[in-house]
Amino acid sequence: IADPGYKYNVFEYQRDFLNSYESIKQKGCLPVLCGGTGMYLESVLKGYKLMPVPENQELRNRLANHSLEELTEMLSQYKVLHNSTDVDTVKRAIRAIEIEEYYAAHPVPEREFPELNGLIIGVDIDRELRREKITHRLKQRLDEGMVDEVRRLIEQGITPDDLIYYGLEYKYLTLYVIGKL
């Protein structure tokens, strides 16, 4: 879907889903949406009205010296904070404020969104069993060369910050590879 280092976002996920959905429906087939984070799935299933938001370097510079607590307070002035990932780092909090500022100046245009009568199937798994499965999968990925994969990606020019963006596995392996863990 995207090259390593590219920060694929929920807007693009929704757009790509809609394009694929229409293509599959035109062929007379049943589309199946499988996987993704809760927010990404909800963006499709609930028809979130989204639009691409460009970076605002001037705003980022103004916010750069604020603490996470200050940024969280600023963000709470825009909206009710229901998504804690918006404020788990300074970088994410600044991006969330940047998005809210953009939406305030550029209302989201009405967009046709297909009505989806989705059948939602989820796995309700015991917490300990889930942890065991995650641990097993992580050990398997390590045995299959994930540390070398991270080294190769860095050698190919992917920045450590970009790798850390991809989640916990890459975060801690990247910190290990660059000697910060």
Predicted region positions:
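Phosphate/pyrophosphate-binding catalytic cores of soluble transferases and nucleic-acid-acting enzymes
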Residues: 1-181
